[in-house]
Amino acid sequence: MGDIPLRIYHNNRCSKSRAACQLIADRGFEVEVVDYLKTPPSRDELRALLDKLGMKPAELVRRGEAVFKENYAGRSLSDDEWLDALAAHPILIERPIVVRGERAVLGRPPEKVLELL
């Protein structure tokens, strides 16, 4: 598994995301950093990430964001509707997400990323 590259969906303004990057670097691993706010994943990429995470779209939503509170709070959405919301508003995507091969983890707490190393 040592040759399988790591990718992190990262927001540098997020302390958890920075901590996850540091944990990976401290162990000598190289990682492809994707600033998902500048280069958001497509709807299909989100679906693939969710499959690797073993999560439903609603579980990946950051509910503290203004976009959530203004547009989605109190609403019951289908998985497809949540996927549309995450694709339209990448700020709603919980972070960091670290992917290695066919596995992924949500780095909350950041030490969760160690499961992939």
Residue ranges, per PLM feature:
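Thiol/selenol-based redox catalytic cores and closely related redox-interacting motifs
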Residues: Y36-L117
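General structural signal for secondary-structure boundaries
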Residues: M1-D3, S42-R43
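Local sequence-structure signature of Cys/Sec-based thiol-disulfide redox active-site neighborhoods
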Residues: G2-R27, V31-Y36
